[in-house]
Amino acid sequence: MEELQGYLKIDRSRERDFLYPLLFQEYIYALAHDHGLNKSILYEPMENLGYDKKYSLIIVKRLITRMYQQKHLIIFTNDSNPNFFFGHNKNLDSQMISEGVAVIVELPFSLRLVSSPESKEIDKSMTTLRSIHSIFPFLEDKLLHLNHVLDILIPYPIHLELLVQTLRSWIQDAPFLHLLRFFLYKYHNWNSLITQKTKMILFFSKENQRFFLFLYNFHVYESESIFVFLRKQSYHLRSTSSRAFLDRTHFYRKIEHFLVDFRNDFHTILWLFKDPFIQYFRFQGKSILSSKGTPLLMKKWKYYLVNLWECHFYFWSQPDRIHINQLSNHFIDFLGYLSSVRPTPSAVRSQMLEKSFIIDIVIKKFDTIVPIIPMIGSLAKAKFCNFSGHPISKPAWADSSDSDIIDRFGRICRNLSHYYSGSSKKKSLYRIKYILRLSCARTLARKHKSTVRSFLKRLGSEFLEEFLMEEEQVLSFILPRISYFSKRLYKERIWYFDIIRINDLTNLS
């Protein structure tokens, strides 16, 4: 962010966000190269396009020169595919400009975040809550006292033009919005992709993931902005602040009219939803709203959210995208774990003088387990096993060396062990390790044209244990290696604070 400020020399005159001229600046494409999601064409292998693997400033200079020479930045032809750029290498030019657009469109939001008074508090919280594992201790602390939960899938816009209209409240530069609209229609299949129930990130365009990640995050941010506003206002009914109310271009006028004419109704709505025990958390398009309230209150929340999305944001919210469940008999599918709050009966023996009593009590326990059936499906899609869970060889890796094959399988196994270390029951995790171990052995046997039994008999089974036991070796440095404790260790949940993204195999499920 400091680097961007140094380039742009931000001052008061830039508050109107004129972003279109930035497309003609070389440093924008350099930033796309430096901060890309490892998929930038500026440094990815481009054998099919005839360019080097490294970032080339000459390519950028030629692109900017061609943009200056054209009367219009984008030329549409009569062809059914309106992606013709400058009569040159249209694929390369289109992708380079889209990467520049991805950097530029983030500037108004990033700069406002840095200049906001809340930015320092956000920076402090991010240093301690950087890992997505940090949410599970929070859930364990909060969900034990709640009764019901709303499983919510964030709805999607019914048309791509709604995304552009929403961005108008943040970006006032009309030419840049027209260019953004073009790229949305260039990836016209995005509307059909976001309707899938599968994880969104896997379906983003491989050409420019950063561009679509930003659009999707902004879409989700807008969809829950008013909900967050109402949640805050439920504790401050006398407050009339509108800074947190993110709406369209003329939202100040709307809010003023709203507060004057409908103040009593607004406070009545807030009173209906006032719940000091409500908790809300989200990851990507999946959000959870839990409460200690009655089922009637949860139905009100569901009715309100559906009407809010459909009437205010024009989002298509299907009935099956919000489910009301009771925590005591329902698993929460979140971040690749199945979490639940189960009542656990226990007996307490109390001694009083010469008499003893046995008291039966029920304690709520927060459990997190590995969803074994979806994980087997993910392993089957990745060609490590069939859909019944039987390990198979990986023919695509058979051409690699033995050490590379073992290293690949070992890395996947260690990453899964690392990510699912918080599981309450390790049996499912051991089954996944077994599938990967035998798949590795079958791949090596296929390479050497031998059977698994004869191959393991010749080399010994110890060579596969090395990459499977590395996770335990790391734990031995962190925690004391006591025999009693080490046996208990694998039954306990361990949360790591260095995990910044969900596991790839979990995304496939």
From Swiss-Prot:
Principal location class: plastid
GO MF, one term, reads: RNA binding
GO terms for biological process, alphabetical = mRNA processing; RNA splicing; tRNA processing
An annotated GO cellular component: chloroplast
Q: What InterPro entries does the record tag this protein with?
A: Domain_X (IPR024937), Maturase_MatK (IPR002866), Maturase_MatK_N (IPR024942)
Q: Where in the cell is it found?
A: Plastid, Chloroplast
What are the record keywords, sorted?
A: Chloroplast, mRNA processing, Plastid, RNA-binding, tRNA processing
Protein's UniProt keywords contain S-adenosyl-L-methionine: no
Superkingdom field: Eukaryota
What role is this protein assigned? Answer: Usually encoded in the trnK tRNA gene intron. Probably assists in splicing its own and other chloroplast group II introns.
UniProt lists the family membership as follows:
Belongs to the intron maturase 2 family. MatK subfamily.
Protein name in the entry: Maturase K
Q: Identify the taxonomic lineage of the organism of origin.
A: Eukaryota, Viridiplantae, Streptophyta, Embryophyta, Tracheophyta
* Gene (UniProt): matK
